[in-house]
């Protein structure tokens, strides 16, 4: 287990399963808002951090938000399908892109709850070899691209045992796929 100390002095324990750094390229489709995170970062900049825009879209508002703003909007990272998870061609990114569905090692939140699971508990305690698909992702902060009729869904990735990590895959009903390795703070396009 790795211990990280944050700016405010809180300690975050991160499981070894919580790290994944796949090779990436620059997205030709999307760009995102990027804030410099430190003790000087304002709430407005933090709230915008990670928001995704089409490559030809003009952000409104656009940085700088204030005289000392260090935010930028720049092309986001992209990862090739099959590399977005640790599972290669057996991974959720591969299956969603090629088959339009998750692989068989996924269990719905409802089925997981029927086994006795509750938030904060390890799914592996109730069923081995399965990852959770949590259903619709509401995109409450609006960071994922929005369009009329677009619905987002979410599922765990790179989870094998113990407490769930911060890795998720989100996909839309119209074919967009992104992964996050920091629990929705930032996203990477799956191409």
Regions found by a protein language model. Give the residues of each.
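Activation/maturation switch segments at domain boundaries
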Residues: 2-84
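Functional cores of ribonucleases/endoribonucleases
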Residues: 29-36, 43-46, 115-191
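Intrinsically disordered, low-complexity regions enriched in Ser/Pro/Gly/Gln/His and often acidic
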Residues: 23-26, 87-88, 110, 145
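Alpha-helical interaction segments
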Residues: 20-23, 85, 107, 176-178
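General secondary-structure propensity
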Residues: 57-58, 95, 175-177
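N-terminal "domain-start" segment
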Residues: 79-128
């Amino acid at each position: 287990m790795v211990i990280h100390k944050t700016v405010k002095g809180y300690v975050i324990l991160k499981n070894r399963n919580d790290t994944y750094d796949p090779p990436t390229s620059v997205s030709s489709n999307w760009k995102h808002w990027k804030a410099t995170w430190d003790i000087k970062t304002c709430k407005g900049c933090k709230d915008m951090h990670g928001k995704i825009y089409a490559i030809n879209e003009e952000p409104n508002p656009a940085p700088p938000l204030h005289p000392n703003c260090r935010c930028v909007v720049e092309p986001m990272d992209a990862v090739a399908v099959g590399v977005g998870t640790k599972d290669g061609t057996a991974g959720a990114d591969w299956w969603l892109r090629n088959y339009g569905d998750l692989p068989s090692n996924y269990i719905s939140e409802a089925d997981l709850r029927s086994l006795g699971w509750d938030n904060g508990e390890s799914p592996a305690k109730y069923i081995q070899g399965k990852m959770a698909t949590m259903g619709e992702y509401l995109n409450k902060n609006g960071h994922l691209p929005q369009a009329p009729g677009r619905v987002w869904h979410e599922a765990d990735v790179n989870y094998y045992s113990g407490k769930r990590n911060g890795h998720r895959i989100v996909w839309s009903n119209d074919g967009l796929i992104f992964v996050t390795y920091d629990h929705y703070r930032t996203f990477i396009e799956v191409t």
